[in-house]
Amino acid sequence: MRTRSLLTALVLFLFAFAVRRYFYCGLVLGDDGQEYALMLHVLSRGPDFHDQYHLRFGVWIFNYLSFFLFGISEWSLMLPNWALSSVLGIVAYALLRRWGYGQLQAFLGGLFVVSAPFEVLAGTLRVNDLFLGLAMALGLWALVRFEERPLLQGLAVALCLWFGFYVKLWAVYVLPALGVYYVAERRWRGLAAVTVASLVIHGATCAFWHAKVGSYLPFIEAHAVNWAVPRDRLVEVFLTYPKLIFQGSSEFGTTLFGAVPYLLLALLLVKVLATALRVPASSPLRLDRADRMLLVLWGSFFLLLDFFPNGFQFDAYYSVPRIFRYITPMSFPMTLHAAKLLLDVTRLPALAARPAAAALTLLVPAVLLNLYQTDEATKPGQIYRRAFMAVLHDVEEARPPKLVAEALVASYFRDLYLDPETNRTDVIVQHHTYKTPEYEAWLRAHESSLPEGTMLVTGLASYVHYGAHEDGYRLTYFSAPLSPRWELVRTYNVLTYLPRPEPARLWRLRGAPTVAADGPLPREDVSSLADVNDFVALTRDGMARYQKEDYAGARVYFRKIIDDFPDRAEDAVFFYAASFFRQSDWPRARKEFKRLAIKYRDSRWTPAAYWHIATCDRNLGDSRRAQERLEYLVAHHADDPLSASRASADLKMLRMRREGLLGRLWRAWAGPARRHAA
């Protein structure tokens, strides 16, 4: 019996995992870039608990383990979401078995849960709310599984809620349901156990925070961004989540939950009416204990999520921006409840004679309907990913000297997808550039400086969800056509989900002047400073412009210092080079920092110069050379702790882009094994 249950659980997991891989959408959420950067920081430099995202360790701990074991890749980034969302089917199966359903019925119920549109959607995206949903699901399982062992139940539930709390503070929204469970059923030992365990666990964690950041409650001081909702918009805000559940995406008009909420409410209404009409207690139409438990759980969570203010100020009603992924934690209990109600239909007297056939007849079409609606729910992400991966493939094949694309797309290409071992493309990431007119202005201003063969990606807008549809190189929003020097390489599928549909396109720059890499470098015109001979004033005014990001203006002052005060020009040489680095002019920055390292071998700036040179090499696609420079810096400049620690962190990142711990262990084992076999 145990073997059959394990095999059933394995089949559920594999089915769910395969469905999530099939409908995989990629990095299409607006905060994916921020969270990926967070994970890289934690992996290379450790967490900074003064930041609210770092503080919420439940958001990144699974990805940290995945990167540590498998190395940094899209696959290892998404593995926790694919795997943990697939586990929810096993949790559903285990709960249904505890509530008295047969193995086949529980298996079909688990299939219904893992195939539900929103469950699949959350599993195909980098949705951190999924981890709170998992904590709630495991807490519910522990509550049911250990009812006869209240001490163990209390400890398990407390641990689940503690972990969920450090994904999102919204974990406290389950406390009313938990209180109803313990008080209504007079489970005083369990209530005492979960209370004491929670106090001990949270108390120890708060003591840890105080030791680390000097505050017992940093999650109150650093919390998510919220906004004061005007009174005339309260109804609109309160209707946001219900509309997402019942109508779907307001951006694309696609479903999110499919038929699940309609099935849930329709069957629940039947049960409520049947219970009110006092049908026999043995009737499957009567509300049972599991119905009440699930209803109180998802119902109270929804009410608090929708109406309770977000924040710790009460001078107005504060809310976070209401986006679809925030509903994720309540999706599992809702979907499980719908599955249970469908299974209860198969227990009606007319169907009870053949329960297996009834369950198959009812649940298999429901699962197929789920999959059909899942395709609709994930369609925008699928369309985007198809174009994204096709563009990536062509860029990898072409290996252009430079690549120009929307900032987020470019950063993913450079930092996640392009092979650091073979890529030699300088991917231009235009930070702080958002709307199409900004990108168009940048392109027209810099086109003359781009080398022959530079590639440009257009039509591939920024992230899919949260409305960044007018960001990036969107030709439909350009004020004029591209320069005729841009030659079309390929047109990809049309991004039909956009308000103004546009195909992704890849372009190559032709007829650009070829500039010798070792040619003479332009010098700044310092004639405007001919009468200024005060070293202190030149330094002050140059740094003032540097701090205001007027790098071209700052370089005039630094050049004047370098020419007129060569014996005191050390700082000016460094910031002169750094100004090019700040502008992402990697070739020029590398050249200037090399000059500094050669001329000022014993300068306090030399270690920092080596770090900047290595970073330029990496951004120009030469990871091998970057690694050599970083290793040199660590070996020869340990006396500069800041530069050495930066170099160590960057070395770690470069190595983890190639492989993780398991890869290194495999090489260590397989190498001697191959030599022995030979």
Describe the function of each predicted region.
Residues 23-38, 50-65, 72-75, 170, ...:
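Extracytoplasmic catalytic/substrate-binding loops of multi-pass membrane glycan-assembly enzymes
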Residues 31, 55, 121-131:
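Short acidic/glycine- and proline-prone juxtamembrane loop motifs at membrane-interface regions
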